[in-house]
């Protein structure tokens, strides 16, 4: 593990998450200037870099974090899925983005703009990046009040995932649904469509 990987690992393990979220948007892109190159292209920010930064709390993963927009592998995969396999970006559905990732949040804010900003809702337990703050197990939104929920890498961290899933089901408008976060290794066409009866 190189010095950058060690520095990132130390930072992740010693700086409180809310503070880290406030400063990472400035610090990492400055570090990214050292990674100017053409070998990698981030599908979220469109920037080319020599390589992605290592990232991880334990053993940092190589080539994980975009030094320009802070997107991780799972964020880039989700964005590609949204762009290529959904019609989310063709309109302005009410979208609840739980624990919004910095890079994805920027893209959605650009898409929704000021005219449709009320249709893009960000929420988190404590992140300063979110508009609303709540526990996903007790969502303070009305029944059937959102069209889409993006909840990436969260359910494995809650006390009662079944309760959280019931809450997500409660706030979603009725109709066909697809998972917002495809599991790596599955072809997009193989993703099942969830209907009211199968939820």
Language-model segments: residues:
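S-adenosyl-L-methionine-dependent methyltransferase catalytic module, highlighting the catalytic core
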Residues: 2-6, 28-40, 150, 159-199
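Conserved N-terminal segment of class I S-adenosyl-L-methionine
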Residues: 2-140
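Local beta-strand N-terminus motif with an aromatic residue
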Residues: 92, 146-147
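Histidine- and/or cysteine-centered catalytic micro-motif in compact active-site loops
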Residues: 101, 125-126, 154, 183-185
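GHKL-family ATP-binding catalytic core of two-component histidine kinases
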Residues: 140-142, 159
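A short beta-strand submotif of the Rossmann-like class I SAM-dependent methyltransferase core
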Residues: 148-154
């Amino acid at each position: 593990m190189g010095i950058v990987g060690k520095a990132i690992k130390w930072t992740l393990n010693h700086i409180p998450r809310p503070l880290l979220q406030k400063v990472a948007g400035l610090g990492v892109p400055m570090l990214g200037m050292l990674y100017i190159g053409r070998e990698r292209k981030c599908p979220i920010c469109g920037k080319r870099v020599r390589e992605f930064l290592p990232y991880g709390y334990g053993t940092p993963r190589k080539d994980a974090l975009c030094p320009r927009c802070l997107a991780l592998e799972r964020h880039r995969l989700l964005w590609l899925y949204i762009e290529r396999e959904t019609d989310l970006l063709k309109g302005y559905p009410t979208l609840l983005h739980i624990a919004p990732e910095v890079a994805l949040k920027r893209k959605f804010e650009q898409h929704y703009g000021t005219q449709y900003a009320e249709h893009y809702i960000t929420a988190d337990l404590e992140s300063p990046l979110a508009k609303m703050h709540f526990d996903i197990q007790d969502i303070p939104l009305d029944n059937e009040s959102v069209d889409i929920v993006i909840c990436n890498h969260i359910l494995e961290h809650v006390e009662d995932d079944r309760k959280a899933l019931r809450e997500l089901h409660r706030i979603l408008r009725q109709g066909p649904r697809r998972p917002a976060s495809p599991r790596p290794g599955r072809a997009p066409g193989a993703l099942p469509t969830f209907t009211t009866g199968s939820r």
